[in-house]
Amino acid sequence: MNPTEPIWKSYIVETTQPIFTPKQCQMVIDKGMSLKKETAAVGMGQRPGGGIDPKKRITTISWIPFKDMPEMYRDIEATMLKANGNHFGFEGMRLTEVAQFTHYLTGGFYDWHMDNDVLGKHEPPVRKISMTLLLSDPATFEGGELEIMSKDKTAKLKQGQAIFFASWLQHRVKPVTKGERKSLVMWFGGPSFK
């Protein structure tokens, strides 16, 4: 299935300013660190082709319940809706999944992957927009760059800044070579592609 909507203005959008202050980032970090951590899986987790694969991904994650940080969810969804209206143009977009707190230690990475099932076998709602928000101060780690396979885009985010991109774009987090990288990952979905 090829996505046919909409006529694109852009596939990738960075916020011009941070969405969260350093204090707000620390609140999200504290929440993420307090929750049950799990070794991150690849390829739809427990589904065929999925599971834990240290050749493709080394990081721990935790899931932040909606009820624990409603203001965070409200602010990020509002920003996504603006980005969708100004750039993506999808119909019926909404927050559909809880946020993933990701914690990359030195040596942690996530190889090239997509965030949606382009064949639509496991959905709706269909993931259409992915977001990464950098929680760490970039001065506290080296490496860990987010690369998106679209015009060789490398995101150089400030603390609290977010990037939104089409969920079917291949992307990766390069290995962290020093320090720790903490980020918030979210997905937004809607009805199946037309």
Placement of each model-derived feature along the sequence:
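Fe(II)/2-oxoglutarate oxygenase catalytic core
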Residues: 1-162, 168-194
